Amino acid sequence: MQLIKEIENEELHLVNTVKNTLKLSKNINASVEVFIKKTIGISVNVRNNVVENVEFNSDGGLFITVYNKFSKGSVSSKDFSIKNIKNMLDIAINISKYSSSDFFSGLPDIKFLCFHSMELDLFHPWEFNIENAIKMSILSEKSAFESDKRIVNSEGSFLNSHTTINVFGNSLGVLEKYKSTRYSNYTCMIAKDKNSMQRDFDYSLSRRIDDLIKPEILGQKTAKRAISRLGSRKIQTMRSPIIFSSEISHMFFSHLASAISGDNVYQKSTFLINDLKMKIFPDWLDIEENPHLKRGLGSKPFDNEGVATEIKYIIKAGILQTWLLNCYNARKLKLDSTGNCGGIHNWLVSNQNISFEELLKKMDQGILVTELMGQGVDIINGNYSRGAVGFWVEKGKISYPINEITISGNLRNMWNNIVSISSDVDRRNNIQCGSVLLSEIQVSGN
């Protein structure tokens, strides 16, 4: 109860800070928006049964933007004092005087703003007990070591707890807030046999502490993952079907988010520039953005400009439905904001209601990719090339681990080549998706 009271007091302080900033801004004869984000948390790190680190953190920022007619000035600070706020407003207005006039800048249209924040069940405080957190982290390691003698070392076990408070206001009368919690636990272990040594990790992430994977199960899963990579082999260069496992498939669709972001669209720096309302995925595939998903990791009632978020289709029957727009790039494109200032919310990628095992059988022979490396994706032309590790699949069953491969292609072709998506949805990211089977891709090995 003490923690809840402290958070409520901090929230009240931040709301009053925004109110005071807006009150002071009435003297500068300009449109103003104010945003405060404050995160309070604690992290415990254990390695080989020894506490390596206990870290308390409190990080936040006050962001002020003024629009002096069509000229913009922005400032930020960690100092929330009245004296500093006055100084920030002076600096922001001075910056705007030296900024070039831009017809597309300005506050959102009032009809798009959020005046009543929706309750999304994001706040689940936990009275953090350091001793219990240490015990939970040690238990993850202990269960990993005990599960198999081939587990020989640990790279650490973590437990994190964070609370974030967001407050937004502007000179059009908006003053809204919401708070959220986020918990995570993580374990990374090293396995060794006569011929090789491999590492792997596992983790969970949730809004409620009780929804995290149990420490002993986390340790066992991590150990199993590390052991499964022992004896990794190299393979020949080939063209092959592949499956992106559900733990990494969100990355595959994150490139879509980049390609349809408003900045890339109005700058014509995306390969999808001419594809709005065009088919770019199989006709059975939908992607819904739901910012109002209860306890969702990407849920929020309003975006970073105070625009109310809404449920919408990104992809419907394989067809691209919308760009991802903030107010500025929306005006550039003569469109309306989609409430995506600050990024995407919860993307729910449809699947074909088949199990992961059925997906393996459907592929029959090919590569299961479980980890990707590098940043070799060019949104301008859609070219894709990334390092990967995973498993060779034979007759619909995982046969042996593989490493040191590169997969390459073009995103447009890769999206069109999606054969099926299984129902093993990973909910630890803003993009929730099952494992994805592609009919064919270039694989470079030996």
UniProtKB/Swiss-Prot annotation:
InterPro entries hit by this protein: Metalloprtase-TldD/E_C, Metalloprtase-TldD/E_cen_dom, Metalloprtase-TldD/E_N, PmbA, TldD/PmbA_N, TldD/PmbA_sf
GO terms of molecular function: metallopeptidase activity
EC number: 3.4.-.-
UniProt entry tagged with the keyword Cytoplasm: yes
Subcellular location as annotated: Cytoplasm
Gene Ontology, cellular component aspect: cytosol
Alphabetically ordered keywords of this record: Cytoplasm, Hydrolase, Metalloprotease, Protease
GO BP: any one term: proteolysis
Family: Belongs to the peptidase U62 family.
Role this protein plays: Probable metalloprotease.
NCBIfam families for this protein: PRK11040.1
Name under which the protein is recorded: Metalloprotease PmbA homolog
Organism: Buchnera aphidicola subsp. Acyrthosiphon pisum (strain APS) (Acyrthosiphon pisum symbiotic bacterium)
Top-level taxonomy: Bacteria, Pseudomonadati, Pseudomonadota, Gammaproteobacteria, Enterobacterales
